[in-house]
Structure formats: structure tokens, C-alpha cells
Amino acid sequence: VDVARGKGLDYSAFSVINITSMPYDQVCTFRSNGILVADYADFVYQTARLYNQAYVLVEINDIGEQVGWTLQNEFEYENLMLTESAGMKGKRLTSGFAGSNKDPGIRTTKPVKSTGCSMLKMLVEQNQLVINDANTITELSTFSKKNNTYEAEPGCNDDLVMGLVLFGWMTNQQYFKDLNDINTLTKLREKTKEEVAED
């Protein structure tokens, strides 16, 4: 869940991903540059409930923290993904009730973005994430490397893509592996070996 201020600039956006098996499948998207943060939290909550009580990972940089807080404290949404400090490893997904050391979402730091971009790249290149939305495809086509990071080219958006970057990061977390019994990175490595063997 990527959150914007609702002032007509960046988009508040999210994708719903079916994670029951690989390849993962983008089954729904939302993108709006006019929705207010309070309304967006409610919309995310209603959508997650409709999609089988979906797990929700909110980017909590800046105004996104309000969406995470609302999902956690006002709606008491049980499938909100929490993160905690993992020492030198940065952040990790965790379960359980919120505490003083747990956040209702993830801050997009350099390590989170780097891991997320790498995982997303592998998922897309190996056809292990089916992207069904035209806006997402358009954003991916203008999401390029600049210096030591990836971002939208000037005049373009990357709000849906950043949600997928966070999904990529999440697939590499132990909690995600335990949740759906899929080790994404291992599966991607196996697929790479198969492709090399076929060549």
C-alpha cells in the first residue's frame, strides 16, 4: 500500500496479489491521486476484507504511517503486517500484537528498496509474478536505474511499482515463507538453474 497526500500529485495505490502459489498473480489494483488519507485507510480495509482478509503491508514513510495506524488502532485489522528491528539486518516482518518496537508497516529504506527491487526484477523476468494491470505495466516501463537506486523517469509515476517493490521485499522475509510455505528466492534460483540447463 503506497500512500499519497490526496492533493492531485502522486497516487495512493495498491495491488492485491494472490500468494497461494507461484507464479504470484496480481488480481486487483487501485490508484487515485484525489483520495484523502482517512478515506484511503477505510478503502484499504474494506478491500482487504473482501479479498479473503488479505494481508496488508503499508509503506509508512511520511503520511502512510496514518494509514497503518488507522488499520491497526481504529479498524483493529488482524492481517496488518508489522515490522520490527532486526539489528544489522534492518527490518523484518513479524506477527503478533503491536508493541513499542513494532511498526504497522514498513519504511522504505535503502536496504528495503534494494532487496525489493532485486526480488521484483527476478519475479518479473522469470514470469513468477503475473501483472495484469495496464497502469502497472506502464509504470514498470519507466522505472529505471538512476545512480544506485531505481525510480520513475522524470514526469512519470512509480506508485503501483513501489507497492510491488515492497511485495518483492516481503517475499524474501521468513514470516512470508512461513505464511504460505513458499520460499520465493529458492524457487527463483531453481527456475534459473532449469533455464540455464535448457540452454
What does each model-identified segment do?
Residues Y77-V112:
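Conserved phosphate-binding/catalytic loops in two-lobed NTP-binding clefts
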